[in-house]
Regions:
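Structural transition elements
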Residues: 2-45, 63-68
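Bilobed periplasmic-binding protein-like "clamshell/Venus-flytrap" ligand-binding domains
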Residues: 45-62, 108-111, 153-189
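Solvent-exposed loop/turn segments at secondary-structure junctions
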Residues: 4-8, 17, 62-66, 92-94, ...
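Sec-exported extracytoplasmic/periplasmic mature domains
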Residues: 1-6, 44-49, 75-83, 100, ...
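Extracytoplasmic/secreted proteins, especially bacterial periplasmic and envelope-associated proteins
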Residues: 34, 38-41, 65-72, 76, ...
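Short, solvent-exposed loop/beta-turn-alpha elements that line the ligand-binding surface or hinge
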Residues: 17-37, 48-51, 98-103, 124-151, ...
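Extracytoplasmic/periplasmic, Sec-exported soluble proteins
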Residues: 5, 27-35, 61-69, 87, ...
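Periplasmic binding protein-like
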Residues: 76-127
Length: 239
C-alpha cells in the first residue's frame, strides 16, 4: 500500500474531513517494541501460546494489493505471536455475499469511501441493523451517540460526540485500521481553478486553461548603414 502513497491509519475516519476531530489511541505513540510486548501479553492472557496458537483466516477480494496486505499481516502475526493464518482469496461477488450474510466470522478485508464530506458517513455504518454493517456490531450506547450526532446543531458539540463515538468503536476493537486511500492526480500548470480536496470532486465549470504564448524568436542584430565614401581634399575643393 505504501508504494501507492496510502497513509498509515490508526483510527476510522479520514484526516481532513469537515468536522473531523482526529482520534488517536494511546498505543499510537508507543515504540514498535512496546506494541509487540503488549500484543504478546494480551495473546497469552487470552489463552494462546506457541503450543496452542490462535488459528484464523483473512478473506479478501481478488486484488494484488489486497493479497500483499494479507500476506504482510499474516507474516507479522506469525512472527510476533505464532498465529496460524489461512489466506482466502474470493471473487468479489462471492466475497461480498459471505461478508454481508456473515456466514464467515473470521477476519475479512473492508474499505469505504465516504459519500459526503462528514465523518458521520463512516460512523453510521456501525449502527445496529445498518445495511452496511457487515461487522455485526451492535452497541446501544453507540447507537444513542449517533442519534445525538444526527440532531445536534452546535458544531463544537457535534464534533465532540463524533469523537466519542469513534473512541468507543475503536475501544470495542471492531476493526483494525491499516491505511487511508489517497488519490493521485497529474495536473497541468496551465489548468486553473483546480483545488485539491478530500472528496476528490472537481467541477469542470470552475476550471479554465491558460494559453501559453510562444517565446518570440530573437531578432537578428541590425548592421549599421554603410559609411559614405571619403572624398579626397583636392577633389572636394574642385567641386
Amino acid at each position: 500500500a505504501a508504494e501507492c502513497g496510502e497513509q498509515r491509519s490508526v483510527a476510522l475516519g479520514a484526516a481532513g474531513m469537515d468536522g473531523d476531530v482526529p482520534f488517536s489511541p494511546g498505543w499510537a505513540d508507543w515504540t514498535q517494541e512496546e506494541r509487540e510486548h503488549e500484543a504478546r501479553r494480551l495473546y497469552e492472557q487470552a489463552g494462546y501460546s506457541p503450543e496452542r496458537p490462535l488459528r484464523t483466516e483473512i478473506r479478501f477480494n481478488t486484488s494484488e494489493n489486497h493479497k500483499k496486505m494479507a500476506l504482510a499481516v499474516a507474516s507479522m502475526w506469525k512472527q510476533q505471536l505464532g498465529v496460524v493464518t489461512t489466506l482466502v482469496n474470493e471473487e468479489f461477488r462471492v466475497f461480498m455475499q459471505n461478508r454481508e450474510q456473515r456466514t464467515v466470522t473470521e477476519v475479512f478485508r473492508a474499505g469505504w469511501i465516504s459519500d459526503y464530506n462528514d465523518p458521520y458517513s463512516f460512523l453510521e455504518m456501525f449502527r445496529t441493523g445498518h445495511g452496511r454493517n457487515d461487522f455485526g456490531y451492535s452497541n446501544s450506547t453507540f447507537d444513542a451517540l449517533l442519534d445525538q450526532i444526527g440532531t445536534e446543531r452546535v458544531r463544537a458539540r457535534r464534533e465532540r460526540l463524533m469523537f466519542e463515538a469513534e473512541r468507543m468503536l475503536m475501544s470495542d476493537h471492531v476493526i483494525i485500521p491499516v491505511y487511508t486511500y489517497v488519490t493521485k492526480r497529474l495536473v497541468s500548470p496551465q489548468l486553473k481553478g483546480w483545488q485539491n480536496n478530500v472528496m476528490d470532486h472537481h467541477p469542470t465549470r470552475h476550471m479554465y486553461k491558460l494559453k501559453l504564448r510562444a517565446a518570440a524568436a530573437p531578432k537578428a542584430a541590425e548592421a549599421p548603414p554603410p559609411a559614405e565614401p571619403s572624398v579626397p581634399a583636392d577633389e572636394e575643393r574642385q567641386q
